[in-house]
Each structure stands twice: as C-alpha cells, then as structure tokens.
C-alpha cells in the first residue's frame, strides 16, 4: 500500500526516520513596504504578528505572521527570545522579509512570479464563502489581480 493519496512520478514511498519530526514552518515572501503588507495581512486577512526580528547590520527585517488558529496561540511566550524559538516550532507561518529602503524607491519592484518568467504563483487562504470574502476585500480597498470568476479557474 502506498503512503500517498495520489500517484505521480518521483514520489518516494519510504519515509526517512530522520524526517519524522520535521514540520512545514513557513513560506517567505519579500515585501517592498511593511506598512502596506502588514496592514493587508493583519486587517484584511486577520493574521497576527508573532515575531519581528530586525537585522540592523544587514538592513532587513523579518515579520512572522500566522492565523491564530493555525498555531499554538495560547502558548506563545511573552519573552521575545523564547518567542523566536516558539515561532520556528509552529506550522503555517508567513515570513515577510523587508529590505530597508525599498519602500522609498519608486522604481523598486519584486518579481511576482505571475508575469514572465513565471515562477511563484500565490499563497492560499481558505474562506467559508469566496464571494462574500471578495466583496469584503473590495469594500476594504483591496485591488484584485484576478477575481474569483476571472480566467479559467472559477470560485
């Protein structure tokens, strides 16, 4: 019997015991302006900032966010050093990386992966009703790249 739910070339059937305690901790995205990005992820999406780490010698900041129900929110330590360790033990964190000064550079742009050459596509959030969520996003001023029924993929 296979350990996978689907078949595809390249799947490994044997689990290396050394990976048993691995967790998927984070996806990292580079951002231009933390004020804009943090507003979107906390006000519009409802995420919570769990850890902010400044690297002044290298001039960048990391922001670790998550949906409160996706992490062990009740046990997040108050102490920032302990919360760093806690952050790296959680599941489904979003890491936003801001390189200082990019927010003031009008010509600066990160490649979004959707224009050529394509690469990264998106991160996804499940919502109870995609149309109701989209209406809420519009009321809150979110600019859509593609609405739920635009393009080939619907809903």
Predicted features and spans:
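Vicinal oxygen chelate
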Residues: 1-20, 26-29, 53, 108, ...
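Core segments of cupin and vicinal oxygen chelate
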Residues: 18-22, 29-93, 132, 139, ...
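A periodicity- and composition-biased signal for non-globular, repetitive helical segments
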Residues: 36, 104-105
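Active-site/binding-pocket entry motifs
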Residues: 70-71, 99-103
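Short Gly/Pro-enriched turn/cap motifs at secondary-structure boundaries
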Residues: 85, 114-115
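A short beta-loop-beta micro-motif enriched in histidine and acidic residues
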Residues: 119
């Amino acid at each position: 019997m296979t350990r996978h739910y689907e078949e595809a070339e390249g799947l490994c059937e044997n689990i290396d015991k050394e990976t048993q305690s691995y967790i998927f901790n984070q996806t990292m995205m580079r951002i231009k302006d933390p004020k804009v990005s943090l507003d979107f992820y906390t006000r519009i999406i409802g995420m919570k900032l769990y850890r902010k780490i400044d690297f002044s010698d290298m001039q960048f900041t990391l922001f670790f966010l998550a949906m409160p129900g996706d992490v062990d929110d009740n046990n997040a330590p108050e102490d920032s050093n302990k919360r760093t360790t806690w952050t790296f033990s959680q599941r489904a964190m979003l890491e936003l990386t801001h390189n200082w000064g990019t927010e003031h550079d009008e010509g600066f742009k990160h490649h979004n992966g959707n224009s050529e050459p394509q690469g990264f596509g998106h991160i996804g959030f499940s919502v109870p009703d995609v149309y109701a969520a989209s209406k809420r996003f519009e009321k809150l001023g979110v600019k859509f790249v593609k609405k739920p029924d635009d393009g080939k993929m619907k809903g």
